[in-house]
Amino acid sequence: MNPHQDPLWDRLSAFNFDDTGDALTFTQRLARENGWSLGFAQRIVEEYRRFLYLALRASHSVTPSDAVDQAWHLHLVYSRSYWDNLCAQVLQHRLHHGPTRGGQSEDDRFLDAYEATRDSYRRCFGSEPPADIWPEPEVRFAPQARWQRVDLAAHWY
């Protein structure tokens, strides 16, 4: 995999996740909904771009970091951008999001895919995935992690 000699990478690099006509852009909404700074959300979008490349070019199933997964989830909400623009024109492939079905075998499968994704990232992009976005597997899949999206304005006391 060499993204710099690949038309797919050229198309991904040119793809703009933000519609400049929007009062609240994709990246701004990603930041707002996750309590991130705009700068951090911009970094997440770039890592999402890299993940999309790996999803099509790696020879194995890929699993995103939690932060990259949040970008993917939000992008799926922008259905025309995701399906009509990204998948149809840029990726030229329908990329479906497959969540876990639960259970130990699924946990093992996603852990293995996450480790393989980070390895492919290193080989493809020639650097370590940023640790604050792509944490070690034991952090990403920590058993004590219990993720839940909550409206803090309505439910924080």
Q: Model features per residue range: what roles?
A:
Residues M1-Y157:
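Intrinsically disordered, low-complexity, repeat-rich regions
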